[in-house]
């Protein structure tokens, strides 16, 4: 809590936290151990707060990306303090048999659940971790560029350290 309080005191206006309020912990529902109003806690730290629920009034679930975007755009207008956005969700949605189930917190979903999730989302359940070739090639170029930049920095630092042994120590 000290870090969050410090962020509020320092008015870190470019910091945004999106809190996934799925109401589940390893032992069951969070209400057995978590009673405070999280938004009021962050307001007390000096943060701007807002919330959106993906759980609809009728109990159905819809990830409202447009609504979340509006909440984030509104928060973006706040520049004098950090932002805390609470998003009410269902853990493991839309995994068949695991949605809103404490067993999905902190443990593997399992082969059958992953297969069902892939089918639900329209992915081939027999393909593990598909990566687009163009995206992979781009990631490799970025990695190469990073390695080159790191080597150049190491060389420049070594020259500087040799020329400035007192400061480099």
Stretches with model-predicted labels:
Residues 1-143:
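Glycine-rich ThDP/TPP pyrophosphate-binding loop and its adjacent helix/strand module
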Residues 141-169:
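Hard-cation-handling environments
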């Amino acid at each position: 809590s000290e870090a969050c309080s410090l962020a509020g005191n320092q008015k870190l206006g470019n910091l945004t936290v999106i809190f996934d309020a799925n109401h589940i912990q390893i032992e069951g529902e969070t209400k057995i151990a978590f009673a405070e109003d999280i938004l009021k806690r962050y307001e007390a730290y000096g943060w701007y707060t807002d919330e959106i629920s993906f759980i609809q009034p009728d109990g159905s679930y819809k990830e409202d990306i447009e609504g979340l975007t509006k909440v984030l755009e509104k928060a973006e207008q706040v520049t004098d303090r950090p932002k805390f956005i609470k998003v009410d969700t269902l853990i493991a949605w839309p995994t068949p048999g695991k949605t809103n189930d404490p067993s999905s917190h902190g443990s593997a979903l399992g082969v059958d659940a992953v297969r069902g999730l892939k089918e639900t989302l329209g992915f081939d359940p027999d393909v593990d971790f598909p990566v687009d070739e163009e995206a992979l090639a781009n990631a490799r170029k970025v990695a190469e560029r990073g390695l080159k930049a790191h080597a150049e920095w190491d060389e420049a630092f070594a020259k500087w350290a040799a020329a400035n042994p007192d400061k480099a120590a």
